[in-house]
Amino acid sequence: MTVGVSRCCRTPLSCRLPPARYASPRPARKLYKSTLAARHDPIFRDFADDPARGGLWHLRLASSNLPLILENQQPFFANGLSFIHNGDISDDRGINIVLNRAYPINQGAFLSTGGRSDSAIFFSVILEYIAFGFALDEAVAQAVRQLRQAYPKSSYNCMIQSQDQLVALCAAGREKTSPRIVEIYDEYGKGEKAHDYRVMRYRDVQDRDGKPSGVVVASSGFEQNESDGWKVLENDQMIVASNRTGEYHVRSI
């Protein structure tokens, strides 16, 4: 499971500080990608300890039959947006969308992502809808509707972040993990963790005074107990959060 990190940072303030402390100047963005597994990457701990008001972490396996190369590592970054995707956009035969030459892709948007994968294609479709004038959350929803016309059973779970906003979407096409995904996990000796591959959960974040100040959204891979405040993000729902105030709401697509 490789590591990719994008953080919206403003040292020395922490992402858990009260919203009123977030003032200009605008925070700097840090982007790091590696093909190393996070547990073996010496930079991982540095990023984990780095204060930030918002961030995306992508510690996932690669899509089926796609190469483990730096260009495909996430987060992707384009037009001031960071994007991560947990899914495999393939048809019932397991043929990935990157091999579908007939699928219409905006080459300019695709090249701007810097990637070559199905996730890069997904991001490029979102970028198109943003260029059409849609708000960030609705651009994500429109992109999923478009891709589902050709790939209805694929997973479109994703997160996208701007300087001001975070959108996290759960949009799986199957109730159970497909055998193909289980096989990929088995290859890495992680087959027992494939059952909740498409599950996303979230919980509130509190500041030092115990007041709500943000939200954490995560996919599977570590314990997310209800007793600790974790709630399931239902299928076809998204969280839309402010990176400035920490306020968020849940909407359907």
Specify the residue positions occupied by each region the protein language model found.
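N-terminal segments that mediate ammonia production and transfer
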Residues: 1-253
